[in-house]
């Protein structure tokens, strides 16, 4: 779960919350929610909006959105469709006030956070896939460094800039890089 969260947080939208996420995880910062009605959706991520599914759940529970409306919101946010977001915003704010018991100011504040979050946010399944690849990659590099670096350099054989970086990494790891030898 931690790797998945870090993959999702390391994006331009939620990246600003990485330090807070870590402090909250380790009990060094209080976990807060803009509204108590968000606790169910944000509890697993220490009160921080990390995944698309979370704002979809909040829109259903806090704003009274249907599944279809929540999916429209996801499309608007995920694809940065500004016109669609402007169309959905009044429904979201009104729903938060009427259904969720939020103040208009609170609903507007969350909407602003949602707009910031829209910058390249991930759904959890994408983060999980990338996290799994990152885990495998780290495992292979740690346990089979020679083979890993050889495969990496082979895959980048036509990119001299990448090869230079990888050769420096080999040197740092204590791996000898030998020049081609036909004998």
Stretches with model-predicted labels:
Residues 1-183:
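Noncatalytic, beta-rich nucleic-acid-contacting surfaces in large DNA/RNA-processing enzymes
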């Amino acid at each position: 779960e931690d790797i998945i969260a870090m993959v999702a947080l390391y994006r331009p939208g939620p990246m600003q919350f990485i330090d807070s996420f870590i402090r909250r995880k380790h009990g060094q910062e209080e976990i807060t929610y803009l509204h108590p009605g968000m606790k169910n959706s944000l509890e697993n991520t220490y009160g921080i909006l990390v995944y698309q599914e979370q704002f979809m759940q909040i829109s259903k529970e806090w704003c009274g959105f249907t599944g279809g409306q929540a999916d429209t919101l996801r499309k608007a946010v995920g694809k940065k469709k500004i016109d669609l977001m402007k169309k959905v915003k009044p429904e979201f704010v009104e729903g938060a006030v009427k259904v969720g018991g939020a103040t208009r100011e609170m609903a507007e504040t969350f909407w602003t956070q949602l707009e910031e979050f829209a910058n390249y946010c991930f759904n959890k399944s994408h983060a999980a896939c990338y996290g799994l690849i990152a885990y495998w990659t780290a495992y292979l590099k740690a346990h089979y460094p020679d083979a890993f670096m050889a495969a990496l350099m082979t895959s980048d054989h036509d990119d001299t800039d990448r090869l230079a970086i990888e050769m420096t990494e080999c040197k740092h790891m204590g791996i000898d890089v030998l020049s081609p030898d036909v004998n």
